[in-house]
From Swiss-Prot:
CC annotations in GO: cytoplasm
Keyword line: Transferase, Tricarboxylic acid cycle
Active site: H310, D368
Name this polypeptide is given: Citrate synthase
PANTHER family: CITRATE SYNTHASE (PTHR42871:SF1)
Gene Ontology molecular function, alphabetical: citrate (Si)-synthase activity
Cysteine pairs bridged by disulfides in the record: none
Pfam families in UniProt: Citrate_synt
GO biological process assignments: tricarboxylic acid cycle
Top-level EC class as recorded in UniProt: transferase
Organism: Bradyrhizobium diazoefficiens (strain JCM 10833 / BCRC 13528 / IAM 13628 / NBRC 14792 / USDA 110)
Pathway(s) annotated for this protein in UniProt: Carbohydrate metabolism; tricarboxylic acid cycle; isocitrate from oxaloacetate: step 1/2
Length: 434
C-alpha cells in the first residue's frame, strides 16, 4: 500500500502565522509530517543534521522497529528467512516483493548462476592496481567499470535493461570481490562454477587454488549464506541513501552501486565489525574485562565499547542472535571453539546485558559483535570484511534503486543547508589586500 493522508494535520506556528502540514500514515511504523510545500508557503527550510528524523522516500522493502528489535524484509521476519531460506530466495523476495514458487526459484537461481562470469578484460583491469591496494578500493573501481563492459544494460528507462543489470550485479559482484581478494594475495583468479550454490561458489573463488581440489565445507557455506541474508538490506541507511541519491540524477545502475560501496567503506558504516574484532583482541583475555569496562564508563577515557548499540535498534539487534549461533557453529567446525576472542566476547556480552550502566544506555550487542570473529574463523582477512558486506548488500541497494526509479514522486535529491559563512563582500585586487 502507498502512504495515505490521514485526517490529522500538524500546525507549525511561526510568529503570527500558522501552517497546516499534512500527516501521512504507512502500513506500520511512525506517521510522517509532509513538509514538501513548507518552503513555498513560508520561505523556511527544516533543519535535521544526519536526516535522523526525516523520511526521504516511501518504501515497501524493509521495515525496522528499533524499539522492539524487529527487522522484516517485505513483511517476513529476518529470523524466519535466515532459518528457512537461502540467500538467492531472499534476493528474489527483495527484488520482486514475494517469495518465489519452486519454478520461479529455479529460474532465478539459474539466471544468477549464468551471469557470474565477468568479461575477460576485467583481469587486465585489475592489473592496474597495486598488489597492496585495499580490496574496497578495487571494488569501487571495478563495479563502476562494469558500465564500460555491459553498456547494453545502462538505460534506466528500459525495465528489461534494469532487470538485466540487477541480475548481472548480484551475480558478478561476488566474482569481483573474490578477484579483489586473490589479487591482493598474489594468487590466480578462480573462475566461478555453475554447479555450486551462491555461497559455495564464493568460498570456492576465494580459497581454491589450481594445484589442488578445494572441498566446500557445508557448515561454512551455510553460515556465509546466512550472513548474506542478515546483511541483504537495512532500510534507508547511509549507503542505501547514497545509492538512491546517485540514482535520482539518472546515473546508470553500476555507478549507483559503486557509490554505495564507496559509502559503505567508511568505518562508521561498514567497518564496525573490524572495530569490534580489534576491541576483543585489545582486551585479550577474560580477566582483563573488568579493567576495560571501567575505562568504558570513565567519561575522561577515550575507550569505547564496539559492537554494542545501534543507531536504529534500541533493543537487541535481531541479527545478533542469529549471528551468535552461527559463530559458535563456525568456531566448532574450524577447531576454534576455544578461541580466546570468543570467550572474551561471551563474557563481555554477559556483563553488558546485566550491568545497569549499559542497560540504561540500551547498549545491546549488534550484528557486528560476532560477525568479525565468524569471518576471521572462515579464513577471511580483516580487509575483506566490508567487501563481504558489500556482496550481501548489493541486492538491497538494487532493490531500493529499482523502487526509486519506478516511484512517480521521486525527484533528484537536493538537500538544503543552513548557511553560516561570510555574508556578501566585494572583491579586492591582490595589490590592495592586507
Amino acid at each position: 500500500m502507498d502512504a495515505k493522508a490521514s485526517n490529522k494535520t500538524a500546525t507549525l506556528t511561526v510568529g503570527n502565522k500558522n501552517y497546516d502540514l499534512p500527516i501521512h500514515s504507512g502500513s506500520v511504523g511512525p506517521d510522517v509530517i509532509d513538509i514538501g510545500k513548507l518552503y513555498g508557503q513560508s520561505g523556511l527550510f527544516t533543519y535535521d543534521p544526519g536526516f535522523t528524523s526525516t523520511a526521504s522516500c516511501q518504501s515497501k522493502i524493509t521495515y525496522i522497529d528499533g524499539d522492539a528489535g524487529v527487522l522484516e524484509y517485505r513483511g517476513y521476519p529476518i529470523e524466519q528467512l535466515a532459518e528457512n531460506g537461502d540467500f538467492l530466495e531472499t534476493c528474489y523476495l527483495l527484488l520482486y516483493g514475494n517469495l518465489p514458487t519452486a519454478a520461479q526459484k529455479k529460474d532465478f537461481d539459474d539466471r544468477v548462476i549464468h551471469h557470474t562470469m565477468v568479461h575477460e578484460q576485467m583481469a587486465r583491469f585489475f592489473q592496474g592496481f597495486r598488489r597492496d591496494a585495499h580490496p574496497m578500493a578495487v571494488m569501487v573501481a571495478s563495479v563502476g567499470a562494469l558500465a564500460a563492459f555491459y553498456h547494453d544494460s545502462t538505460d534506466i528507462n528500459d525495465p528489461k535493461q534494469r532487470m538485466i543489470a540487477s541480475m548481472r550485479m548480484i551475480a558478478k559482484i561476488p566474482t569481483l570481490a573474490a578477484m579483489a581478494y586473490k589479487y591482493t594475495i598474489g594468487q590466480p583468479f578462480v573462475y566461478p562454477k555453475n554447479s555450486l550454490k551462491f555461497a559455495e561458489n564464493f568460498l570456492h573463488m576465494c580459497f581454491a587454488v589450481p594445484c589442488e581440489e578445494y572441498k566446500i565445507n557445508p557448515v561454512l557455506a551455510d553460515a556465509l549464506d546466512k550472513i548474506f541474508i542478515l546483511h541483504a538490506d537495512h532500510e534507508q541507511n547511509a549507503s542505501t541513501s547514497t545509492v538512491r541519491i546517485a540514482g535520482s540524477s539518472g546515473a546508470n545502475p553500476f555507478a549507483c552501486i559503486a557509490a554505495g560501496i564507496a559509502c559503505l567503506w567508511g568505518p562508521a558504516h561498514g567497518g564496525a565489525n573490524e572495530a569490534a574484532l580489534a576491541m576483543l583482541a585489545e582486551i585479550g583475555s577474560v580477566d582483563k574485562i573488568p579493567e576495560f569496562i571501567a575505562k568504558v564508563k570513565d567519561k575522561n577515557s577515550e575507550v569505547r565499547l564496539m559492537g554494542f548499540g545501534h543507531r536504529v535498534y534500541k533493543n537487541y539487534d535481531p541479527r545478533a542472535k542469529i549471528m551468535q549461533k552461527m559463530c559458535h557453529a563456525v568456531l566448532k567446525e574450524t577447531g576454534h571453539g576455544d578461541d580466546p576472542m570468543l570467550k572474551v566476547a561471551m563474557e563481555l556480552e554477559k556483563i553488558a546485558l546485566s550491568d545497569q550502566y549499559f542497560i540504561d544506555r540500551k547498549l545491546y550487542p549488534n550484528v557486528d559483535f560476532y560477525s568479525g570473529i565468524t569471518l576471521k574463523a572462515m579464513g577471511f582477512p580483516v580487509s575483506m570484511f566490508t567487501v563481504l558486506f558489500a556482496v550481501a548488500r548489493t541486492v538491497g541497494w538494487i532493490s531500493q534503486w529499482s523502487e526509486m526509479i519506478e516511484d512517480p514522486q521521486q525527484k533528484i535529491g537536493r538537500p538544503r543547508q543552513l548557511y553560516t559563512g561570510v555574508t556578501r563582500r566585494d572583491y579586492v585586487a591582490i595589490k590592495d589586500r592586507k
